[in-house]
């Protein structure tokens, strides 16, 4: 449920900021190495442990490497919740342990107009990423408690709306009332399985196949 909310927030945010239903630029994905046997593929909400190197496309200069700049240690992150670049969330789905990918990330899915550190504004980025481990993502009990304002173990439309408004404000997005209402209705249509007008703790924590 939490990951569906994040995906819904991201989709609406993109629409609002672009001013039209224009598709986002896509990441170019090249598989450099793939294991013969793959027991599990990454999906939204998974914890991933990776080594990576990042380069500027324009001149091939290295701006970060976990091997060189992170005491040689790989990094953990959660896929699909905007914890990392949008380009990573898009380009690292369906990946196997032992797989290596090269991602070409356009500015809109990287650091955009602002840039960051050694990365100039409007830079296309190249990442070589090696997946070392996949784990189940964090439990969503804490998120449910945060949303359940009256502690009745079920979420009303008002409670979900308040949560979404806070998440939008956290990311600096301004969305009008009608957008919030439409998003809440869409969430309840998908998550309120018994159609009683509330999302129960069970419905909230249930992991849907499409996630």
From Swiss-Prot:
Pfam families according to UniProt: FKBP_C
EC number: 5.2.1.8
Xref: PROSITE patterns: EF_HAND_1, EF_HAND_2, ER_TARGET, FKBP_PPIASE
InterPro entries membership: EF-hand-dom_pair (IPR011992), EF_Hand_1_Ca_BS (IPR018247), EF_hand_dom (IPR002048), PPIase_dom_sf (IPR046357), PPIase_FKBP (IPR052273), PPIase_FKBP_dom (IPR001179)
Binding site for Ca(2+) 2: 192, 194, 196, 203
Domain PPIase FKBP-type, first and last residues per copy: 45-135
Regulation: Inhibited by tacrolimus/FK506.
Residues annotated for Ca(2+) 1 binding in this entry: 148, 150, 152, 154, 159
Subunit structure: Monomer. Homodimer. Interacts with type III, type IV and type X collagens.
UniProt protein name: Peptidyl-prolyl cis-trans isomerase FKBP14
Organism expressing this protein natively: Mus musculus
